[in-house]
């Protein structure tokens, strides 16, 4: 009986662990794995990332993002032109075509938060509200992650 109970608890634990999801759904929009880069003391800018899947029957637009921890919350594009990184605020929002997905990730589209007014130390999540043109708004938790690239770690001054 003890053996059965042990395996039952082990199964239940594994099931519960795997059932936790980083997916959030609003109408026909799925948002996967939202996260933001952690910041150092005194830093006033950070960025956020996620994947958006549009399962609706028409295009939609991520119009804006809202959060209390930063005064400025913007959607940005980023690309390299003539070996120079260029970021652009997408004032009209980010188009998500019908039946497609778009990744907001380092080196590409991303969310930019500046004039940060809240200490992020000891926090694991921050809530942000995403506003879509057709599918409405949803407030979701963004996991705070330390993210360092190999290039950054080996950078020498």
Name each model-derived stretch.
Residues 1-4:
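Positively charged n-region of N-terminal signal peptides that target proteins for export
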Residues 22-157:
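Compact, glycine-rich, soluble single-domain proteins
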Residues 7-15:
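Bacterial N-terminal signal peptides
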Residues 17-21:
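Sec/Tat signal peptide C-region and signal peptidase I cleavage site
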């Amino acid at each position: 009986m003890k053996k059965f109970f042990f395996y039952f608890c082990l199964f239940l634990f594994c099931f519960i662990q795997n059932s936790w999801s980083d997916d959030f759904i609003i109408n026909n929009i799925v948002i996967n794995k939202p996260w933001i880069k952690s910041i150092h003391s005194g830093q006033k800018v950070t960025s956020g990332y996620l994947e958006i899947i549009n399962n609706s029957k028409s295009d939609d637009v991520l119009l804006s993002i809202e959060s209390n921890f930063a005064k400025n919350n913007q959607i940005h594009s980023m690309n390299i032109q003539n070996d120079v990184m260029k970021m652009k605020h997408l004032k009209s929002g980010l188009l998500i075509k019908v039946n497609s997905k778009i990744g907001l990730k380092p080196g590409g589209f991303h969310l930019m938060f500046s004039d940060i007014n809240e200490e992020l130390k000891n926090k694991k999540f921050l809530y942000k509200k995403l506003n879509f043109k057709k599918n409405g708004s949803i407030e979701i938790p963004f996991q705070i992650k330390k993210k360092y690239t190999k290039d950054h770690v080996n950078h020498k001054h």
